[in-house]
Amino acid sequence: MTTAAPTPSLFGQCLAEFLGTALLIFFGTGCVAALKVAGASFGLWEISIIWGVGVSMAIYLSAGVSGAHLNPAVSIALWLFAGFEGRKLPFYITAQVAGAFCAAALVYTLYSSLFIEFEQAQNIVRGSQDSLALASVFSTYPHPALSVGQAFLVEVVITAILMAVIMALTDDGNGLPRGPLAPLLIGLLIAVIGSAMGPLTGFAMNPARDFGPKLMTYLAGWGPIAFTGGREIPYFLVPIFAPILGACLGAGGYRVLIARHLPSAAAPAEAEPEKVRAS
């Protein structure tokens, strides 16, 4: 008789979320740092692909232990629509934010001399409006032509798309099981979203991915502008609340518009009369 594998401890799950989130932030922000201060020549597609592959690698790293949420918006949506245990929510979110913070701090440490050299060459005073160009290495800020409301809408829409497709890719009842391919497909989706909508808001889609690095830049000398983005309404609120709303809309929309119409969803209801007739 085979025995079921033990469920990972909550500590182990949180550690996996910490490491997975840290890995994706390390690759993503490291790529942008290379572009901004080290003279690398990446285009939008290359940057988006690096972020996407970073997410895929992070999922492969952590999925077996924690489910690889790596995103508070995803955790909240899964709690509301997919049975994730609510008691784990604050621990997962804390681990995700901490992982993003530590990875951003590590990238900053590794590139610190290049940041200082770039600031001196460009006469940039850290904490000024001009310094947002370097703060954006670590977290997201909207295109200057966008209002805060427009940026909020962009983040809601792209996170809803992300969450709906995540639900589809991890739903074995929806077509062929994706299995080991799902992380790669999720990474490709992020790359496509980044290429299409990245210039508008930086495609945050993840409160931890944005808030953790923003906190790091605040402490590293950028000060309040790291959170406000130079806007009257502090911009840091947008990449927190818009992705949460978007993820919930995406997960709920998938359940209502797709999952309920799948053949597998109708099968149990159709099988029940068959049992009655056989009895």
UniProtKB/Swiss-Prot annotation:
Sequence motif NPA 1, location on chain: 71-73
Membrane protein topology class: Multi-pass membrane protein
UniProt KW rRNA-binding keyword: no
Subcellular location: Cell inner membrane
A GO biological-process term: glycerol transmembrane transport
Entry GO CC: plasma membrane
InterPro entries: Aquaporin-like, MIP, MIP/Aquaporin, MIP_CS
Keyword Transmembrane: yes
Motif (NPA 2): 206-208
Intramembrane segments: 67-70, 71-81, 202-205, 206-219
Cytoplasmic side: 1-8, 64-66, 82-87, 173-180, 258-279
Family matches, as PROSITE patterns: MIP
GO molecular function, one term: glycerol channel activity
Pfam families: MIP (PF00230)
The entry's keywords: Cell inner membrane, Cell membrane, Membrane, Repeat, Transmembrane, Transmembrane helix, Transport
Family annotation (Gene3D superfamilies): Glycerol uptake facilitator protein
Membrane-spanning residues: 9-37, 43-63, 88-111, 147-172, 181-197, 235-257
Membrane topology, Periplasmic segments: 38-42, 112-146, 198-201, 220-234
Catalyses which reaction(s): glycerol(in) = glycerol(out)
Family assignment from sequence similarity: Belongs to the MIP/aquaporin (TC 1.A.8) family.
Entry text on domains: Aquaporins contain two tandem repeats each containing three membrane-spanning domains and a pore-forming loop with the signature motif Asn-Pro-Ala (NPA).
Cited function: Mediates glycerol diffusion across the cytoplasmic membrane via a pore-type mechanism.
UniProt-recorded name of the protein: Glycerol uptake facilitator protein
Gene label: glpF
